[in-house]
């Protein structure tokens, strides 16, 4: 082992620290405290919920679940976008020891059926009528699924009605039997490296990082705050932050997605925003597009460089020159002010997780007045962020340090391993896969590569399974280059390829909305088909600038020599994106195998003239072939003896052709081999 860092726990969880206890303690402290808000579908008006009201609703639904035959250990499926009802069911299941099994709202009927078949639930909740129809079709084929309730058809009221015969004392007895080490949920991994697996997580897995998180990020997580929650609650990251806000002094604004993100930011006025990298890339890309070309575009580019450097200087020395201060005032007034305004007047923290984010983009946001950019690291198997930047120790570019009582170390290959009370129980019905990642000493193999500095800060360098080994034997991590390419406003995803190939290449997926807007700004046809856009010289030249930026950070052997722009978008339906918008690399490589092999790495026809010796042999061979054909035609009308003589001549000609050959001369072969070796070097 190269390095290990394990902080002492600031708070040791007890058996009573369940997820339901986070809500019940909050309601007991102040039942009139505002705890949640949800939007009306038609008017988009926010509706308030107090802590006491939410607790009362959760208890009523919990009694209804008991009335339906749900008990400790029973599986309850939730197939819905993020909404207040999702949160109520989550806490109701936690209260009675039932196991919630979330299904992403974007999962197909086949994917939902696969999960339901594996966990055998007796009850499922749907977010709308379409999800209800899917679940009812699945129910016809799975006898274990008895009940389907639709949130949009007053499903919670219907469930609560089944609890009329369940007394408060009975419910309290059931709640008291639930302990921190009991299973809380089965969360299916996003499947970015293969088939999704069901990770079993306990109450303690979550409550340990929630309660210790209040200590290291008190201002952001525990003090009165407002969280706009639009990430899918099927994702561990969103689930964790919901528990944080409910258990502290936060208000959760439940939203089904980010369709109206800017308008919702203005109306809800959050104090911090939780997002995956794509959210922040889109905010930056929108601002960059709005600036456009010309003077405004150049000012925006200068502002970007300034905010990045300001953040770096603040982090390293905390000092700025008089010139830098004057520039900062100017760039805040012409660029920073509008972005701050779009984020809302109360925004203080931006938190990013779920995947790596380009470090300069993180510095860009962090360099603006009043914004602290926080990065963290976690996975489904660790109940989300177990490594995070602390309030008094934030290093942009790092994912932070392990939280109290949690540890990180690297093995000899540079793979990160983690440990702590937050590490999952195992994969559901897959003990052999659990044994592959969960070691005998309690440490978990993450599959991610990284480094740990002297102060315990962790830096992610790539994904172990994503490492590309070129034909020349060079090991290349695609993540650093992809991070830079993805900052191009018209790019959704760049996927670096080259395993077993002579050089590194890339597939480029365009952001179709942004690229059409960009074309219009350039005075080009924005309505042309995507097939033409993908081949457009201006589009290619613009992306080339970002490829060159990426190449500037790596050696020639690691640089992208060639890229191909795709004319279609990645999607969950195609299998190329997970529900949390991560690229499923194996599926991308398989889907675009023909593009990779026959476009990116198509052998080039040689324009180099053949050496004179080869030209002479070539002409000789052609003359022999012509003579052979003439003799064949003549032989058709001669005697058998002459025909036999012709056949003998044919054999001699064939042997002569093989001896002279049309292949490369030794000189050419050596030259080609030397060129290839030079390119790989």
Positions of PLM-derived features:
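Conserved pre-ATP/AMP-binding loop-to-beta segment of ANL
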Residues: 32-34, 150, 166-188, 195, ...
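ANL superfamily adenylate-forming
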Residues: 40-43, 130-180, 287-338
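Conserved ATP-binding/catalytic segment of the ANL
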Residues: 402-405, 409-470, 487
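Conserved AMP-binding/adenylation subdomain of ANL enzymes
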Residues: 207-337, 346, 368
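Conserved ATP-dependent adenylate/AMP-binding module captured primarily in the ANL superfamily
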Residues: 74, 90, 107-137, 209-228, ...
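Structural core segment of the AMP-binding/adenylate-forming
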Residues: 68, 95-162
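Conserved AMP-binding A3 loop
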Residues: 47-52, 184-210
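Conserved AMP-binding/adenylate-forming core of the ANL superfamily
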Residues: 36-91, 108-113, 160-163, 203-204
